[in-house]
């Protein structure tokens, strides 16, 4: 019996030992991956990042970004790609479809938003060093995955090339430079293109092509690394896409600026008791924890204290009946293989000034209504431009490395001062280096005055502004009409009461980035010492 049992036990024991041995070999790797998911601080979706975060700069931690693609509402696609090898990375997000859905995406190389039914956005970014770049084409309503749907080039290529198309329009981008090229396109609902180029790529050129066969190209000037908060110095590229004219950034006289705060609402996410006010947990009656998901099934976002007809503080954008902060979120590393929800965390405090201080406001004219649009310093982004109430279909692109000295503005009859040249499809590229100087563009309501704060060229009664902060409109005679959305007032020695200047950085430094609270209206009142001389 013992002799007959021994072989049986030997067989069983051998199999058992083999199973244990295999388990011992496999489980540590699996456990290590699982544990690494939670022990690696770069993969913690609840962490709060900053522009100098090693997880974003590639100096330690986890430098691998996984792509995310998805669809939202009645037809939009989301795709992103990021480069490796250090430097800055980027992501792109397109928004469209049902009202209330908001899918922000930011990277320290570019920030892009697209709105409008049936639109799609594809982004490609690369690091400032020789990293990889790629793109994910998407079509309206599709949901390309993060594998098998890539196009473009990767690795340490010099001069990458990729093409993207959507159901309603086509954009082609090609770059050739001494470094890795990068770019993205944002086709909008009216087929107007808004391209984003990385100014840190010297000698980069871009080409815009529409389905009608019209093709224009322009060269981008390099920018210096000593420009504060510019993309060359590590700041973000912030641009907008969508129906800027006339449904975005509406401005009408007489109202005080309103700070809008996005408050999170929902029924709770995975592992969270249903009914809590925050999608990712938190105590009832308390502000929500750092936001880690923007998936609408886990709770959306709504505006507290603002509406589409209120003034917008610089850094806020309006889309589909809601107002959202730009640069409010920063994209963290999503865990590879995680569910199809990208990880987002609350960004660094606004007081750092990285997201807002480099956003001069470029007023535009559309019929009788005045609208404003944000155009950051040195982004090379494009704006809708041209005469008439509908604006031009072509890009209006002031490729400058500093504050734009010319505004892309024209009257309904087409102004000779219009950088784009009437309503043509050509991009506008104002001459010079784009240094901040006095300039004006004719329009039906008056002039655009660009003067630095405290400049000796500021005459009595004219607005004085901090460099890279504000642009004000005025009457035909040059008298200013400060734009309250910028928190600006006529200031300087020539103004009544000698009101000091306020910069966007000063204003937004006092706006808390999280929570349902509204900023004290006194934040927007002039403060500080009087400015009598430069």
Curated annotation (Swiss-Prot):
InterPro entries: Corneodesmosin
Function recorded in the entry: Important for the epidermal barrier integrity.
Region Disordered, annotated ranges: 38-252, 396-497
Keyword Signal recorded: yes
Bias-annotated ranges (Polar residues): 454-472
Compartments, record wording: Secreted
Gene that this sequence comes from: CDSN
A GO molecular-function annotation: protein homodimerization activity
Official protein name in the record: Corneodesmosin
């Amino acid at each position: 019996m013992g002799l007959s049992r021994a072989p049986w036990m030997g067989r069983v024991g051998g199999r058992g030992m083999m199973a244990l041995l295999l388990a011992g070999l496999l489980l540590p790797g699996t456990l290590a991956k699982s544990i690494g998911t939670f022990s690696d601080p770069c993969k913690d979706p609840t962490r709060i990042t900053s522009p100098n975060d090693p997880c974003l700069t590639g100096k330690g931690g986890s430098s691998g970004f996984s792509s995310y693609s998805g669809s939202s509402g009645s037809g939009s696609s989301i795709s992103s790609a990021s480069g490796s090898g250090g430097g800055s990375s980027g992501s792109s997000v397109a928004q469209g479809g049902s009202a209330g859905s908001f899918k922000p995406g930011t990277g320290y190389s570019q920030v892009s938003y697209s709105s409008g039914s049936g639109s799609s956005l594809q982004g490609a970014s690369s690091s400032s060093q020789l990293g990889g770049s790629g793109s994910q084409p998407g079509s309206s309503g599709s949901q390309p995955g993060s594998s098998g749907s890539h196009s473009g080039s990767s690795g340490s290529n010099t001069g990458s090339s990729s093409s993207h198309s959507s159901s309603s329009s086509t954009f082609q981008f090609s770059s050739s430079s001494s470094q890795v090229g990068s770019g993205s396109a944002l086709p909008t609902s009216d087929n107007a293109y808004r391209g984003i180029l990385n100014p840190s790529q010297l000698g980069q050129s871009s080409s815009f092509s529409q389905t009608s066969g019209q093709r224009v190209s322009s060269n981008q000037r390099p920018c210096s690394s000593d420009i504060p908060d510019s993309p060359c110095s590590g700041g973000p590229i912030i641009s907008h896409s969508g129906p800027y004219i006339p449904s975005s950034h509406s401005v009408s006289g007489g109202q005080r600026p309103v700070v809008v705060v996005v408050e999170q609402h929902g029924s709770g996410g995975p592992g969270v008791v249903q009914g809590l006010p925050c999608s990712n947990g938190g105590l009832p009656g308390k502000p929500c924890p750092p936001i880690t998901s923007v998936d609408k099934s886990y709770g959306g976002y709504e505006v507290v204290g603002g509406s589409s007809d209120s003034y917008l503080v610089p850094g806020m954008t309006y889309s589909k009946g809601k107002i959202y902060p730009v640069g409010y979120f920063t994209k963290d590393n999503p865990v590879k293989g995680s569910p199809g929800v990208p990880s987002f965390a609350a960004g660094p405090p606004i007081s750092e000034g990285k997201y807002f201080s480099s956003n001069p406001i470029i007023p535009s004219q559309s019929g009788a209504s005045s609208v404003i649009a944000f155009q950051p310093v040195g982004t090379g982004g494009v704006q809708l431009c041209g005469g008439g109430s509908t604006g031009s279909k072509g890009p209006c692109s002031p490729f400058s490395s500093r504050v734009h000295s010319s505004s892309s503005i024209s009257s309904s009859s087409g102004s000779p001062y219009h950088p784009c040249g009437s309503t043509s499809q050509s991009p506008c590229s104002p001459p010079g280096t784009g240094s901040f100087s006095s300039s004006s563009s004719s329009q039906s309501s008056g002039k655009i005055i660009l003067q630095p704060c405290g400049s000796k060229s500021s005459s009595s009664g004219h607005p004085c502004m901090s460099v890279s902060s504000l642009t004000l409109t005025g009457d035909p005679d040059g008298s200013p009409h400060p734009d309250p959305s910028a928190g600006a007032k006529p200031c300087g020695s020539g103004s009544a009461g000698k009101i000091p200047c306020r910069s966007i950085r000063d204003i937004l430094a006092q706006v808390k980035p999280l929570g349902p609270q509204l900023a004290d209206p006194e934040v927007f009142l002039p403060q500080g010492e009087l400015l009598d001389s430069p």
